Amino acid sequence: KEGALENEKTMNGKNAAVVAINPKTGQILTMIGSRDYFDKEIDGNYNVTTALRQPGSSFKPFIYATAFNKGFTPDTVLFDLPTEFQMTCNAYGKALPGYSQSNCYMPQNYDGKHRGPMTLREALAQSINIPAVKLFYLSGLSDSFKTSESMGISTLTNVSRYGLTLVIGGGEVTLLDMTSAYGVFANNGIRNKYTGILKVENSEGKILEEFSLNEKEILPKNTALTISDILSDNKSRTPTFGANSQLLISGYDVAVKTGTTNNNKDAWTIGYTSSIT
């Protein structure tokens, strides 16, 4: 709570939520739905962990995982340059005669800069938007959507509704689903669906329900390890985040991805080790 209150002072973050899951079992270790359950000013009795929110760039690893499954590598190069993705618009993002300007799509990077050729490692580590949208297009919207769904994202029902904006957080997901899905990366490609119940007994002590491990391989181990390696690569993210950012946790090998929604309304940080997400 102290950290959340400090965030309100420094970043105008009026509320906060956190989920922690053991990726080896899927067991929920912590679920805090708001900063203060009794604070009516922030609707404290509302569980933000199960609310639909846009994930921003924290959705990108699902698209990169799909690409790595298809033969792309961390050393594959894409160009971070102004790019119009709609064929009915010109290279400068203006609609061609007879077509609507609203259909044009020329994504921007968060800082407005363009870095030219970038490896996929650099692009993901620094969370650069334009290469991510290009990779989403090249990997296939449908296949990328299936990857996120198989990893535990349950709220995106129609990829055509979002189009290319999905890679930079255009859909709505829950923190609980996102934490669980990142657990697949943490657990070397193996998914354990989240659970908050270990055992249910009746008044006579008879066990009605009991937790049992139910593992399912979702990603090739090498794909999961590659994503984890990039998200823990401080050198690759340094040009954007700096060498000593808050993403660097001294003494621990932690993979971290951030996400920020439009107008900084929501800020996500999802981090994991092999034992906690």
At which residue positions do the language-model features occur?
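A penicillin-recognizing enzyme superfamily signal
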Residues: 1-10, 18-22, 31, 38-48, ...
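Short, glycine-/polar-rich solvent-exposed loops and beta-turns at beta-strand/coil boundaries
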Residues: 10-14, 78, 159-162, 246-247
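Glycine- and acidic
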Residues: 13, 42-50, 129-131, 158-166, ...
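Structural recognition of the beta-strand scaffold that forms the well-ordered cores
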Residues: 17-20, 29-31, 76-79, 122, ...
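Conserved catalytic neighborhood of penicillin-recognizing serine enzymes
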Residues: 24, 72-144, 191, 202-233
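Active-site SXXK
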Residues: 26, 48-81, 86, 123, ...
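Proteins synthesized as precursors that undergo proteolytic processing into mature forms
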Residues: 34, 39, 68, 75, ...
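Mid-domain, small-residue-enriched loop/turn segments at the edges of structured enzyme/sensor domains
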Residues: 92-94, 98, 102-107, 140-180
